[in-house]
């Protein structure tokens, strides 16, 4: 299911309202964080995770052994074939291949009920059948700063906030109660983690979005360095949003 930049007026037909939103930063992987939440008495809750997409090719470099977040999601679930749906191929991947800039767009592919059937070790192992679980996946691309891009920090932050709002709106439209996010675009796409973390914080402080989810989890693997993405996001998002 594809969501375009210009169809936001159709949203909010059935969105939920929560008195407060619990925001947590955890040193974990995306699917592992979702699995732990679902196993903690929340099996009936609707959980969505953010897939940090390659906007040109479904699954990025999964067939070539790449180990970024999207590839790990594809190796552990049936997400990869789902991204070859005609709508996703035409309106997301081909659409972005036809563009010449590296900032990409706010377009989103929403895939409900993805089945996770492997763990997310470097070489994923099949889980026992009773440990399989389902999550919704929100596929969206961050701007890519690995190529020369002429954009000011303030404009980049505004772009991220627009994209984050779109991710939230799509999740809200599907009555997601818990969303698992992360250091969106702060790895191979080379976006500055503090700027991205502050963009997330400011959106989640807005009146609409602060009541949209019961829980928001930022799952970010830590490499132990004081300046790694996990620690930067923990510093920015680990305090009350107010």
Specify the residue positions occupied by each region the protein language model found:
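Macrodomain-like recognition of ADP-ribose-binding/processing modules
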Residues: 1-179, 183-242
């Amino acid at each position: 299911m594809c969501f375009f930049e210009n169809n936001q007026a159709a949203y909010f037909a059935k969105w939920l309202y929560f008195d407060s939103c619990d925001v947590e930063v955890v040193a974990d992987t995306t699917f592992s964080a979702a699995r732990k939440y679902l196993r903690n008495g929340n099996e009936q809750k609707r959980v969505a995770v953010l897939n940090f997409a390659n906007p040109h090719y479904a699954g990025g470099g999964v067939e070539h052994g790449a180990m970024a977040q999207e590839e790990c999601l594809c190796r552990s679930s049936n997400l990869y074939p789902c991204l070859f749906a005609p709508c996703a191929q035409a309106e997301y991947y081909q659409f972005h291949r036809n563009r010449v800039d590296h900032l990409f767009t706010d377009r989103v592919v929403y895939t409900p009920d993805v089945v996770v059937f492997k763990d997310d070790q470097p070489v994923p192992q099949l889980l026992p059948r009773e440990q399989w679980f389902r999550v919704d996946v929100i596929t969206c691309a961050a701007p890519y700063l690995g190529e020369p891009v002429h954009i000011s920090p303030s404009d980049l932050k505004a772009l991220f906030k627009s994209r984050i709002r779109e991710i939230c709106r799509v999740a809200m439209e599907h009555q997601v109660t818990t969303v698992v996010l992360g250091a969106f675009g702060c790895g191979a796409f080379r976006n500055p983690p503090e700027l991205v973390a502050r963009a997330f914080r400011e959106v989640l402080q807005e009146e609409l979005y602060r009541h949209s989810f019961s829980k928001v989890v930022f799952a970010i693997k830590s490499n132990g360095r004081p300046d790694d993405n996990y620690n930067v996001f923990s510093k920015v998002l680990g305090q009350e949003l107010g």
